[in-house]
């Protein structure tokens, strides 16, 4: 890192100004956390962050969960190429899940020769080394690791928020759902040592963080790869003991692995937020088998019953795919049945799209677009009906809200988040950001509330 830092300083001195950087994040919260580390490394070697993609060093941290995500990135890379013509000092780096696919790297080499650095998901800690290699060789640097069992600790990180932070507890995925590319680009499951996780959280709290989001592709698998196994329930109990930490969230649990121990820990916790994101994907047992989800409709509903028995007011959200290959009207009605029985606060809904490299992409009986679209609209209607009934129940109540930002549409309002992950907008000032305040939930607006802050 020292060699790269010296090289960056040399160029900055020649230009008579600091070199700037910009990191653009595509995709999930795992990518967002990786981008914070990339920003931390760039600041450590002497770059200064910029909001503009006209910066001297631009990083695209890519997502490849859907084919259109790739298309979007290719378009943006072309835009960067035009910017680079105007700025000979500009450097472009591409990383993330998309770069783990060999055909993507080949396309970058042939069609986007102005790109300087290409690396993947397993070696972001090498960014400074790769930058130095580009400075010295004057050629495109490509460094893709297909697999790794390495977890590098103590990387510098530049948090997006001062009051909340994501904390990786594990990397990779072993589930191989038939529609999903993630295990192929993120690798097999690897868990961080609990001591390293707790150390990071304590450091974050010392800097003012009051809420952490524990991150993993399947957090319920945490600890299985450790020399001395630790369960996710045990880790939650350890995190609960961190003084000064006020809220704990986690994402994402897999329904097949969410244990009674985790439910019990949540029930007794004073810090774990009243929310579980529990992806169902489909309500049809037959489709769940094709998806390789490893649970049935009945298994899922029984799990929801156990959760609600322990925590009657729990907020549940989910992911649902419509139009998976072979989906019949009966299969779809099973999905609507689950939505009605569970009563989700909200749902991330998707029309299935082929993802090359996954088993589902070659399955027979792909669903016609018009059929999938019609079912999608019926699903949205059912979810809205369900969520509005649930949200209305909390109108008039007073709840604790973590204030996150000035409202984007009206700067006289602040936007905060309830324990159940629902947004609340209310009159206030930016000095409240990062504080937990009491707010009366005056009016439900569907997926958010208008509120009134209560005076002490």
UniProtKB/Swiss-Prot annotation:
Catalytic activity: N(6)-dimethylallyladenosine(37) in tRNA + (sulfur carrier)-SH + AH2 + 2 S-adenosyl-L-methionine = 2-methylsulfanyl-N(6)-dimethylallyladenosine(37) in tRNA + (sulfur carrier)-H + 5'-deoxyadenosine + L-methionine + A + S-adenosyl-L-homocysteine + 2 H(+)
Superkingdom in the source lineage: Bacteria
Presence of the UniProt keyword Nucleotidyltransferase in the record: no
Amino acids binding [4Fe-4S] cluster 1: 28, 63, 97
Alphabetical list of SMART domains matching this protein: Elp3
Record-level GO cellular component terms: cytosol
Pfam family, one: TRAM
Gene3D superfamilies per the UniProt record, alphabetical: Methylthiotransferase, N-terminal domain, tm_1862 like domain
UniProt keyword list: 4Fe-4S, Cytoplasm, Iron, Iron-sulfur, Metal-binding, S-adenosyl-L-methionine, Transferase, tRNA processing
Name listed for the protein in its UniProt record: tRNA-2-methylthio-N(6)-dimethylallyladenosine synthase
